[in-house]
């Protein structure tokens, strides 16, 4: 069972967590949104889901409690549990205030619309710095979970806001395992002290958590490589591989297992370790 989190909690002298009030299997206790800084105007990281009045109420309460206002909004990635609350915040905080809303571009680029289109994202890039009183945030491009995912390094604390790249509990999902593993390794190089995740409790041993994530994926990958190594002359469909790799997975999870397996296969293909043929059906085989 996920650990209970307070709806509003001061985590450090410059970080306040406001829970998104949207608990669920994918969001754990809810989306973590953060007010960052020490002054009368602070940066809001992520916005929760649309149409959650409890969250707007909590955010208003936090702004009053800490005698501050929103300077601007940073969105870690496009998923609706992180970007969906933008319109509600703009409408209900300070009477239709138009905030500066920043994120990374989708890759490949595509049009992104906020609400009815009255507001637009301001696109930032890897390495950009966003400042407010008491806080300096450096943008870290961390694709894998999504193509536009960013983490943020809070330089004053050597802490990472990880979005959904790393969660406080359990593991995350991803679109591209090759990019995701590169992102984990890049975050590891920072040698951060703390991780403020997009869901779940604060992670106080950042290095150990990142290594745990890397190990989890490497173990599955090694299992797949071993199967190809032991059957070097053979080629396999994804379904055939699933029956050997995920032997104990119930039938209702077969599609998800095959999806995860396919992400591993695509990474191994990028690594030059396997390839596939499509005649008569798509099959994967070890590289000679």
Swiss-Prot record:
GO terms for cellular component: mitochondrial matrix; mitochondrion. The modification N6-acetyllysine is found at residues 102, 282. It holds the Pfam family BLACT_WH. The modification Phosphoserine is found at residue 235. Its cofactor is Zn(2+). Keywords: Acetylation, Endonuclease, Hydrolase, Metal-binding, Mitochondrion, Nuclease, Phosphoprotein, RNA-binding, Zinc. The modification N6-succinyllysine is found at residue 273. It is an enzyme of class 3 (hydrolase). CDD domains: LACTB2-like_MBL-fold. Belongs to the metallo-beta-lactamase superfamily. Glyoxalase II family. Endoribonuclease; cleaves preferentially 3' to purine-pyrimidine dinucleotide motifs in single-stranded RNA. The cleavage product contains a free 3' -OH group. Has no activity with double-stranded RNA or DNA. Required for normal mitochondrial function and cell viability. Monomer. PANTHER family: ENDORIBONUCLEASE LACTB2. This is Endoribonuclease LACTB2. It comes from Mus musculus. The gene is Lactb2.
